[in-house]
Amino acid sequence: MEEKRRRARVQGAWAAPVKSQAIAQPATTAKSHLHQKPGQTWKNKEHHLSDREFVFKEPQQVVRRAPEPRVIDREGVYEISLSPTGVSRVCLYPGFVDVKEADWILEQLCQDVPWKQRTGIREDITYQQPRLTAWYGELPYTYSRITMEPNPHWHPVLRTLKNRIEENTGHTFNSLLCNLYRNEKDSVDWHSDDEPSLGRCPIIASLSFGATRTFEMRKKPPPEENGDYTYVERVKIPLDHGTLLIMEGATQADWQHRVPKEYHSREPRVNLTFRTVYPDPRGAPW
């Protein structure tokens, strides 16, 4: 009997100890919101928020926006910019030629002017100008590496229009570049009428007949922009049938202009640009 008890004690020594049942301990938690007074919860949150420090950070990059184009569509004299070069000014005279007479002039010019499509050169690449042109004047005229030969045989209608513009504006002109935009696909790209033969601050008188086209202008960027026109000032001028536009002052030095293609169908448009050409650029007023 004693031997059995001894063996039982030895076997029990090798047995794994009995795990005691874990007694769940209550977790330490904040008091239930149900036991808090109204508003106490928000005060606690407010206390935590007030402990946070607000740090203002300067924006890393300044956002630049291109200015909205200025639209000029009423009669008047407009100073569009002032720079060390001088004042850039445009004068708009809608209805300079009444509609009935303008209709007759458009028909005469489309039929009688010796229109020709010329080949231009830009960046050593030749291209067909997307419009027809003609030149009148005692002297040749060169632009975009195109030379217009002298043509002293003014059409009577053109001479009459030149005289009328001179009488009404006080300016005088000796030459005329004519442009025929046959449809919405014809255009003229960005440029300035700043050839040396025109002298300093040339005055350009532009008279339009036919379909209304938008005359766009953009200011030349300052040197620090490295030729980027993204943020420059812009002007849009709708040129209607019989409208006269005068560009004077520093407009050609400080601005570029163009007549862009249109998305919608357009009837023909004739544009007459009167100017003064000097025989020797060295003798031109600079």
Curated annotation (Swiss-Prot):
The modification (4R)-5-hydroxyleucine is found at L177. GO terms for cellular component: cytosol; mitochondrion; nucleoplasm. Its main location: nucleus. It comes from the Eukaryota. Keywords: Cytoplasm, Dioxygenase, DNA damage, DNA repair, Hydroxylation, Iron, Metal-binding, Nucleus, Oxidation, Oxidoreductase, Ubl conjugation, Vitamin C. Binds 1 Fe(2+) ion per subunit. Ubiquitous. Detected in heart, pancreas, skeletal muscle, thymus, testis, ovary, spleen, prostate, small intestine, peripheral blood leukocytes, urinary bladder and colon. 2-oxoglutarate binds at N179, L180, Y181, R269, V270, N271, L272, T273, F274, R275. One of its GO terms (biological process) is DNA alkylation repair. It comes from Homo sapiens. Substrate binds at W115, Y141, T142, Y143, D194. Residues 22-31 have a biased composition (Polar residues). Residues 172-278 form the Fe2OG dioxygenase domain. It is an enzyme of class 1 (oxidoreductase). It is found in: Nucleus; Cytoplasm. Fe cation binds at H191, D193, H257. Its cofactor is Fe(2+). Interacts with the ASCC complex composed of ASCC1, ASCC2 and ASCC3. Interacts directly with ASCC3, and is thereby recruited to the ASCC complex. Interacts with OTUD4; the interaction is direct. Interacts with USP7 and USP9X. Belongs to the alkB family. This is Alpha-ketoglutarate-dependent dioxygenase alkB homolog 3. Pfam families: 2OG-FeII_Oxy_2. Changing L177 to A/N: Loss of activity against N1-methyladenine. Residues 21-45 are annotated as: Disordered. Activated by ascorbate.
